[in-house]
Amino acid sequence: MSPFLRIGLSNFDCGTCQACQGEAVNPYCAVLVKEYVESENGQMYIQKKPTMYPPWDSTFDAHINKGRVMQIIVKGKNVDLISETTVELYSLAERCRKNNGRTEIWLELKPQGRMLMNARYFLEMSDTKDMSEFENEGFFALHHRRGAIKQAKVHHVKCHEFTATFFPQPTFCSVCHEFVWGLNKQGYQCRRCNAAIHKKCIDKVIAKCTGSAINSRETMFHKERFKIDMPHRFKVYNYKSPTFCEHCGTLLWGLARQGLKCDACGMNVHHRCQTKVANLCGINQKLMAEALAMIESTQQARTLRDSEHIFREGPIEISFPRSIKSETRPPCVPTPGKSEPQGICWESPLDGADKTAQPPEPEVNLQRASLQLKLKIDDFILHKMLGKGSFGKVFLAEFKRTKQFFAIKALKKDVVLMDDDVECTMVEKRVLSLAWEHPFLTHMFCTFQTKENLFFVMEYLNGGDLMYHIQSCHKFDLSRATFYAAEVILGLQFLHSKGIVYRDLKLDNILLDRDGHIKIADFGMCKENMLGDAKTNTFCGTPDYIAPEILLGQKYNHSVDWWSFGVLLYEMLIGQSPFHGQDEEELFHSIRMDNPFYPRWLEREAKDLLVKLFVREPEKRLGVRGDIRQHPLFREINWEELERKEIDPPFRPKVKSPYDCSNFDKEFLSEKPRLSFADRALINSMDQNMFSNFSFINPGMETLICS
């Protein structure tokens, strides 16, 4: 982290300057931070960040980089400039360091006047031996929760890069030429050529995207494949009624010469869209796609018949009559075996969903399904809201039948669809269904849904999360941090053994049970099927924890979890993040380039582990190469006993009752626990079949209900 100054400005004295008389009664200041750069014209200072307007007697932070200066301008309501001065931040930092980390000086302004400025220097917590000084100042880097981010999912079709898009104005599909209905992110739009389509029409796109179709590979593609090379004959046209562009789908604005019209097929486009329209004059993409699909299905059926014919005739040519006779035996009916049930999926017909006949199921499944069909949100009493976000809310809920307490995560279907996160929700459900196999993963009992919401019923962990606890003690001692880290390692290694990359490890997602053992929670960012050499390249995670290979756009595997684990361990031991920046751009630059600062008081084994986790070459990072369990920091850990929870945790949270929620943020607990209702029109237009495989029951839920 680069050091920074916390600066406060106050007591502006205009002096004897007559020009500011009357305006100096209530002046304000502007702060411009400028960077030193070398250019062809010589040395110069450039402002890269927005101008700040700090109120008097307030503070702001300025990072100390070589050559960075701060220009302070005092202004009045009717006067552009009263006075100003420029301060070199490095010199100000040196003055602070010589005066026990703080200074207070009068700045002489030009042309006249002066201002009182106080500054305090911050680097790392290691610069202060007395923790009480930080407690009095209230300065800790880990004072707020940090949300995860995920790059929009890109659908690659014929070189198009379609992403779910919100259309702020009426838009028509460029494939079927029908209106794109719905709210929020109604359809897809190509990031390269701006073509807008329905989500349902994505399989009907036949034109390749190159960003520009003139003399492009797209023309050659259709010329060779379909013998189609029909350029449009566009001419400027005056439209007398509202008309929409048939490429990007939006309205042609203006009073005259609003767009272009093809003389041959009558296609209407914007001037800006002309160069992006494919040479498909007179071609109906929808009908063409349906015809091609029919041809393909016919060819596949013919190929399948030919392969079956060859398979049947093959043994006769080899002359194995007895084998042929044995093939005519009636098929065997499988008998049910004694296998432990891993969970039962069921779906009750939702209002507005298609009700189709389902094949009969085994009797045991029908019995369980009949029991679980009764599970709905009305079977629970919502006592408190434990947390919320854009996705939905988390509640403390009591099951009416057994008086047991659960944590219910309620997702809003409209938000899930709007963010194109249906598959992420299904992944979270599948990962949670595996969690019963490991003690340090949050256990899920069941999932169910209504027309508006998706519900995860999980165990209630009333010990709170590590972010809540670290805010009260600022950092964990070595034994406590080591214990938590060891249990996190076991949880991560279990997920990796199942081909799952977690991708969102952070203090907020590590919960404590009433005994003080950790539980990893929130699996919405997980990636499945990552065994062997499999890799992915989705940009996602919480900014402070994102690995450098993700920022560089490289393909990655479970190596990113070990980088995030290093950030987590650093925060537990030192009390703040290893990488910093005033915005995401600076933070990501710090992650890619900077080396974390290690305080002098940090144990040698802990520093060695962090250094090996913060290796920027993924294949050389500890956890990917080498056994992290064998590191000297964990030499006193008995891993088998730890996994059996036979080692007492160093900290036991204060829990008064099974429904105690005192270890959660008060800002959420004070709100009324109720579901957020979605827009009725949007819900009615939603395809409920997208969530047809969501509902699930774990055998553990049946055991709890029937006990």
Curated annotation (Swiss-Prot):
Which UniProt keywords are given for this protein, alphabetically ordered?
Answer: ATP-binding, Cell membrane, Cytoplasm, Immunity, Inflammatory response, Kinase, Magnesium, Membrane, Metal-binding, Nucleotide-binding, Phosphoprotein, Repeat, Serine/threonine-protein kinase, Transferase, Zinc, Zinc-finger
Q: What is its main location?
A: cytoplasm
**Where in this protein does the record say Phosphothreonine is found?**
219, 538
InterPro entries cross-referenced by the UniProt entry: AGC-kinase_C, C1-like_sf, C2_dom, C2_domain_sf, DAG/PE-bd, Kinase-like_dom_sf, nPKC_theta, PE/DAG-bd
Q: Which reaction does it catalyse?
A: L-seryl-[protein] + ATP = O-phospho-L-seryl-[protein] + ADP + H(+); L-threonyl-[protein] + ATP = O-phospho-L-threonyl-[protein] + ADP + H(+)
Locate the active site: 504
What membrane topology is annotated for this entry?
Peripheral membrane protein
**Which residue intervals define the domain AGC-kinase C-terminal in the entry?**
635-706
Query: What post-translational changes are documented for it?
Result: Autophosphorylation at Thr-219 is required for targeting to the TCR and cellular function of PRKCQ upon antigen receptor ligation. Following TCR stimulation, phosphorylated at Tyr-90 and Ser-685.
> Keyword ATP-binding: yes or no?
yes
List, alphabetically, the SMART domains matched.
C1 (SM00109), S_TK_X (SM00133), S_TKc (SM00220)
Q: Which PROSITE patterns match?
A: AGC_KINASE_CTER, C2, PROTEIN_KINASE_ATP, PROTEIN_KINASE_DOM, PROTEIN_KINASE_ST, ZF_DAG_PE_1, ZF_DAG_PE_2
Q: Where in the cell is it found?
A: Cytoplasm; Cell membrane
Q: What class of enzyme is it?
A: transferase
Q: Name one GO cellular component term.
A: immunological synapse
Residues recorded as bearing Phosphoserine in the entry: 348, 676, 685, 695
Report the cofactors. Mg(2+)
The C2 domain is annotated at: 1-107
Q: What is the annotated signal peptide range for this record?
A: none
Q: Which residues bind ATP?
A: 386-394, 409
Q: Pinpoint the Protein kinase domain residues.
A: 380-634
Record has Repeat as a keyword: yes
Q: Per UniProt, what is one Pfam family of this protein?
A: Pkinase_C
Q: What domain notes does the record hold?
A: The C1 domain, containing the phorbol ester/DAG-type region 1 (C1A) and 2 (C1B), is the diacylglycerol sensor and the C2 domain is a non-calcium binding domain.
In the record, the note on similarity to other proteins reads: Belongs to the protein kinase superfamily. AGC Ser/Thr protein kinase family. PKC subfamily.
Task: Tell me the protein's name.
Answer: Protein kinase C theta type
Say which species the protein is native to. Rattus norvegicus (Rat)
